């Protein structure tokens, strides 16, 4: 999720290159997201500085955003789940309204010591990295056969903390994996978040398949770019420059992943371990990754303490509810935007600045060289 300081940095950049007088340089801004999911990441060392300028790290504390008139619209149709009963339970969790009845219904999915059938492709969602790593290491070690190691090819500048896949991928035949990218070929054989299995592997080749499928295919390495955006001084256009590349097979071991990494993904079957939830929205994100209630298994009973909500988000959401936009407000804002576009056609700010620079140059340089012009 975008932090307030990042949004203000976007504002500063747009003002610099477009229009200094208007928030975000006069650009129309569209932001899409869910505040009830995981909060923006802020280290303690960062917040010790940011707290002097912001009440909260959430985007709505942005100073630039507060200078604008914006409209908040709630999208209500859910596409991941079709079961209205499951949706009602998830919404109670999402809105921090989970009572004993909701918890009891969800805890029906608790299965002590559950051992998932290998062919069904269950994935375990954990709260911490070390938990997921332990599960994956244990499951990989339990497989027979030789482990194979594949090192990523990194060129140019590509910071280690932004690596999109393992620098050294270790797999065996039979390993459960998750794809990390969409297949851009015509075959469209895999997508980001799809669960699969390693069918065969040697020093130079990996054959994989989707879980539950009989059709396997040769997996090829994929390339990710580390991009930088620079301003072309001649054309005044922003151009994309690749600073570095990261090339690796687009998979990782996936008997378990963290809830944080699961955000945005959808699973047919998942085992949820939320007993150590520590962040706003964490439990909701974990539960809502699963398409059906039947595909969900709880590794431990769900407790109220694991459902953590941020009062700052709750207050913002209530304010949005109280000020739902109507058709008139939408129409008025559309008219105001078109008026701004029209006004920009008669904005001579850049000419005014050029004229001021000319006067300064005459005053500071020309008259010193040619004093008789005075």
PLM-predicted stretches and their roles:
Residues 1-374:
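Conserved ATP-binding/catalytic motifs of P-loop helicase motor domains
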